[in-house]
């Protein structure tokens, strides 16, 4: 029935236009792809920070868990924003307007540059938690970026050790203290211009990552 009657494309159908089925790429080269990847990372960090703020307001996370997570996100935000900052994007406000990113809680955290749990006093527990998280990430990021000279690593590592000592809630036998202490001893035997070799960098990253995870487990306990 109805044999020989050609099929007629519906209204708006592509018909015989194969180009309409081709994949549309946002980028033309590797540099453009990296640019869009960097913007996507920044977008994701801001959205995650907004979700974390809402979770804290709803009492879904403890103050210590929130402080650690927010501190890490603030460090990630700074790194992500540096990758997109330029002639097209000069500020985070401009980025949010351009991509219709409505995250007022995250923007407040970014502008204050600290978790909401942190007060101005230096002895505040949450301030110590935030500093420990930030220093762990800072040292590990330096190593990943092949910054390995003794005088570039030791100051942050020493500050990390001192900050952990100020946390009276942290057990005296906390494994992270032992890890940091051992690496400080290693660095103290080096001259300022000496650099860690590849094997030492790999081991130090592994040790610090383990210590950082142990610190997070302590906060969640």
From Swiss-Prot:
Q: Which GO terms describe its cellular component?
A: cytoplasm; cytosol; early endosome; endosome; endosome membrane; ESCRT I complex; extracellular exosome; late endosome membrane
Task: Recite the UniProt keywords alphabetically.
Answer: Acetylation, Cell membrane, Endosome, Membrane, Protein transport, Transport
GO MF terms here are:
protein-containing complex binding; ubiquitin binding
Q: How does it sit in the bilayer?
A: Peripheral membrane protein
Where does it live in the cell?
Answer: Cell membrane; Late endosome membrane
Q: Does the keyword Protein transport apply?
A: yes
Q: Which residues form the VPS28 C-terminal domain?
A: 124-220
Which positions carry N-acetylmethionine?
A: 1
Xref: Pfam families: VPS28
Q: Which stretches make up the VPS28 N-terminal domain?
A: 13-120
> Biological process GO terms, please?
macroautophagy; membrane fission; multivesicular body assembly; negative regulation of protein ubiquitination; positive regulation of protein catabolic process; positive regulation of ubiquitin-dependent endocytosis; protein transport to vacuole involved in ubiquitin-dependent protein catabolic process via the multivesicular body sorting pathway; ubiquitin-dependent protein catabolic process via the multivesicular body sorting pathway
Q: Which residues form a coiled coil?
A: none
The family classification in the record reads: Belongs to the VPS28 family.
Provide the assembly information. Component of the ESCRT-I complex (endosomal sorting complex required for transport I) which consists of TSG101, VPS28, a VPS37 protein (VPS37A to -D) and MVB12A or MVB12B in a 1:1:1:1 stoichiometry. Interacts with TSG101, VPS37B, VPS37C, MVB12A and MVB12B. Component of an ESCRT-I complex (endosomal sorting complex required for transport I) which consists of TSG101, VPS28, VPS37A and UBAP1 in a 1:1:1:1 stoichiometry. Interacts with VPS36; the interaction mediates the association with the ESCRT-II complex. Interacts with SNF8 and VPS25. Interacts with CEP55.
Please give the function described in this protein's UniProt entry: Component of the ESCRT-I complex, a regulator of vesicular trafficking process.
Q: What is the designated name of this protein? A: Vacuolar protein sorting-associated protein 28 homolog
- Species for this entry: Homo sapiens (Human)
**Organism placement in taxonomy:** Eukaryota, Metazoa, Chordata, Craniata, Vertebrata
Give the gene name.
VPS28
